[in-house]
Amino acid sequence: MDRMDSSDEEIDNISDDELQSGDEIEVESSNSPLRLNYILGNEIGRGAFSIVREATSRATGTKVAIKSINTRFIKNKLLMREIEIMKKVGDHPNILKLYEVYETTKHLHLVLELVTGGELFDKIVQRGEYSEQDASKIVRQIVSAVGHLHANGIAHRDLKPQNLLCAGEEGDDIRVADFGLSKIFGDGDYLETCCGSPEYVAPEVLECKPYDKACDLWSVGVITYVLLTGCFPFWDKNNAVLYEKIRNVDYGWPEGLEVSNEAKDLVSHLIEKNPEKRFTFEQCLIHPWVTGEGVSNARKIKPFQQQQPNNR
């Protein structure tokens, strides 16, 4: 389902998913600073206005990813904000690192940490099955990254599986990515932009009420539910019906699916309509299911079955 971007604040980002033909992104000339410092390799990804290539540092031999963005289509202020945020929080082990930025008249080249495992849920599907212990480890890393963002005055606002990358082939070393909708805020500040991906967005955002960083913890709750069940807690082909289910927190657990009480307890404190009652990242990090102490490791989860939850 498409992302929602509507408000008093114009939204754009540098992480578009779909390819558009037309304006190709030219690689800089051989004597450009970028080429002098990096050996460019194969294309490994492409967005509407960007190309990602694998590259190697001439100085250190380190493998990196270089994202080249055609700035003709991107609002410079928002792009600069995304870069500022990535520089500010990239010292966390579970946040995708931005090493350098090269700017020309037509393009921005972002030198990024190279992650080779792909998107989190694609990796899980490849594995075929996993345990609550595996899910707990993944959620623990996501919450740790979210905590680092919040401690630095940043709300991500678009946490979803597509923005969770695997650093390696095993799929258990997570990086939070895509800060195109992220926002810097101060203590006591509220946000107003209605944005995010519908299945993962908090009810206060849908209702266009002032909201804060607690919206990210709702998204963590939805991600956790999907990890545990293989389906969304809120789902309908009709957006209006979907939004109503989210506003009413109308969800249940699939019949016949064994989920530990500790896991259900965590989800219930994250998928909580009142943001003031919703768990903070600090509360999540000490929850028994997140620490691993209250995790059931007996049941193997088969991800992404076609079943839908038994909504109450």
From Swiss-Prot:
Q: Which SMART domains match?
A: S_TKc
- One cellular component term from this protein's GO annotations in UniProt: cytoplasm
Which species does this protein come from? Dictyostelium discoideum (Social amoeba)
Translocase recorded as keyword: no
A single GO molecular function, which one?
ATP binding
- Note the InterPro entries from the entry: Kinase-like_dom_sf (IPR011009), Prot_kinase_dom (IPR000719), Protein_kinase_ATP_BS (IPR017441), Ser/Thr_kinase_AS (IPR008271)
* Residues forming the catalytic site: 158
Q: Name one Pfam family in it.
A: Pkinase
Record's protein name: Probable myosin light chain kinase DDB_G0282429
